Amino acid sequence: MTQQYPLLDKINSPADLRRLPRTQLPELCAEIRQFLLTSVSQSSGHLASGLGTVELTVALHYVYHTPEDKLVWDVGHQAYPHKILTGRKQRLHSIRQKDGLHPFPWREESEYDVLSVGHSSTSISAALGMAVAAQRQSLRQKVVSIIGDGAMTAGMAFEAMNHAGDIKPDMLVVLNDNDMSISENVGALNHHFARLLSGRFYTSLREGSKKLLSPLPHIRHFASRAEEHMKGMMAPGTIFEELGFNYIGPIDGHDVDTLVDTLSNMRSLGGPQLLHIVTQKGKGYRPAERDPIGYHGVPKFDPKESSLPEKAPGIPSYSEIFGQWLCDTASNDKSLMAITPAMREGSGMVTFSQQYPQQYFDVAIAEQHSVTYAAGLAISGLKPVVAIYSTFLQRGYDQLIHDVALQNLDVLFAIDRAGIVGADGPTHQGAFDLSYLRCIPNMVVMAPSNEQECLDMLTTGYQYKGPAAVRYPRGAGVGLELRKGKVIDIGKAQTLTEGQNIAFLNFGTLLPEVEAAAAKFNATVVDMRFIKPLDTACLDQLMTTHSVLVTVEENVIAGGAGGAVSEYVAQHKASPQVLTIGLPDEFIKHGSQGEVRAELGLDAAGIERQVNDFIKKS
């Protein structure tokens, strides 16, 4: 590092931070913000969220005695400043890269990362467990959950708060509100009010009054209503108070001095506390302030430019192809209802949301609700399409079984980010969907090998009377000239190459790698297309003409498509040996998609190597 960061250079841990005089904290915040911008612009990563939490992160580590006190970050997009202050600034340039820093807080990486995260809305539940454990073990540690306003749209967050309000452990929830919808409430009066409400005099008076008035419920109720009326004039915290939390705020999340004062007061309070801060996503970098969504996750870019580099024209992504299919289908069918749990941009639905706003529903981070909401639409004669990432559909699994499949409802699941997603790592890999879908009765499960097949399968699933799923990967297809999607026969595979002895059964978009490997063995190649139902007629023929069946999928081997083939062969006491190639029984680390596939033996060379090893052992 250079003289550009004179204060930050001195900080290798929060203990170093706590040795700084308070007067230098604003200067340190400016250095962290500049360091974050410079580092991420050179390496890519999540930017806007971290820019918005610099002052909060500094104040938390300044007031709380980390790592003894526990900071529990939700999701982790906002935790880059936390990594910088906890001894990882020299490696920040490696974040999200193979063998580099993990993209989110990760327990194996640092003692300051007390909860590994990636999915949203988990922090309050985990922090509550830690707070209860601390009380049971008579520990003096404090526990803080830091959660964004987006994550607060998930029911799990309120389930945890409801429980915390009931059992009342000592804990703090910091609500980082960067939507700016209540920015007019942030000012000098509220700074004074926050200090007042978090101070010992007010809280002692408040708790003492409760005890004094407890035998007099009518008077206590009147006093409570009067208190809420006073606070409600300036603080929109009634819902949190009803859940049993003492609510403080909203305060300016970029005023580090006010944050330190307020957090210092709140650290000494007992029971569940909630501090509501207002921040600006992308704070301090004007392009990110103007376009916080665009600067949420960024490629390498020049900070001196006023915009991110334009994406070079090329082969459309599967997400873009899905979005165009939605628009084309909705143009002729007003019954189509598209649903996403807060993944409009990532799922390719921006244009659809603009052209068909009455047929578009962003239900926020509420995967369970999105699935059952789709069930209700289907019951009423509409045709819902749930666009969801593979890793997030896991969160709506019971609803998929109980509310959709059990009732055999017409719901299409467009499952994006299936297989290896790359830089976001183990919390986001779409590794399990084939396994958890194929065991559900009534489901039709499809995996296209290219973008044209994806269009055909979306059309097929949409027309199908019952629940259907199409899973496709992150990234672009192979560059086919696309025609309109057409309905294909359910459960029918396609034989692409006739060979001898060995048959490769491909499930999904690894087909080019499979074909390259199969050519080395003069093998048959079959694009299976359907995981459920399997093309059993095709399997019957292959079992009589080939001695080795090789299944290839970008899903865990356990319970996946290869398992379905192995089960069928075993049930029929057939002679072919079955080699299943897919993801191993482990959580897949971060790195580029190509790097991860090569490391796991899912490129052409790796597939060829695994087949050769299998034949040698046979």
UniProtKB/Swiss-Prot annotation:
It comes from the Bacteria. One of its GO terms (biological process) is isopentenyl diphosphate biosynthetic process, methylerythritol 4-phosphate pathway. Pathway: Metabolic intermediate biosynthesis; 1-deoxy-D-xylulose 5-phosphate biosynthesis; 1-deoxy-D-xylulose 5-phosphate from D-glyceraldehyde 3-phosphate and pyruvate: step 1/1. Its cofactor is Mg(2+); thiamine diphosphate. Thiamine diphosphate binds at H77, G118, H119, S120, G150, A151, N178, Y285, E367. GO terms for cellular component: cytosol. Binds 1 Mg(2+) ion per subunit. Binds 1 thiamine pyrophosphate per subunit. Mg(2+) binds at D149, N178. The keyword Magnesium applies. SMART domains: Transket_pyr. Keywords: Isoprene biosynthesis, Magnesium, Metal-binding, Thiamine biosynthesis, Thiamine pyrophosphate, Transferase. Coiled coil: none annotated. One of its GO terms (molecular function) is 1-deoxy-D-xylulose-5-phosphate synthase activity. It catalyses: D-glyceraldehyde 3-phosphate + pyruvate + H(+) = 1-deoxy-D-xylulose 5-phosphate + CO2. The keyword Metal-binding applies. Its EC number is 2.2.1.7. PANTHER family: 1-D-DEOXYXYLULOSE 5-PHOSPHATE SYNTHASE-RELATED, 1-DEOXY-D-XYLULOSE-5-PHOSPHATE SYNTHASE, CHLOROPLASTIC. Belongs to the transketolase family. DXPS subfamily. Homodimer. Catalyzes the acyloin condensation reaction between C atoms 2 and 3 of pyruvate and glyceraldehyde 3-phosphate to yield 1-deoxy-D-xylulose-5-phosphate (DXP). This is 1-deoxy-D-xylulose-5-phosphate synthase. It comes from Idiomarina loihiensis (strain ATCC BAA-735 / DSM 15497 / L2-TR).
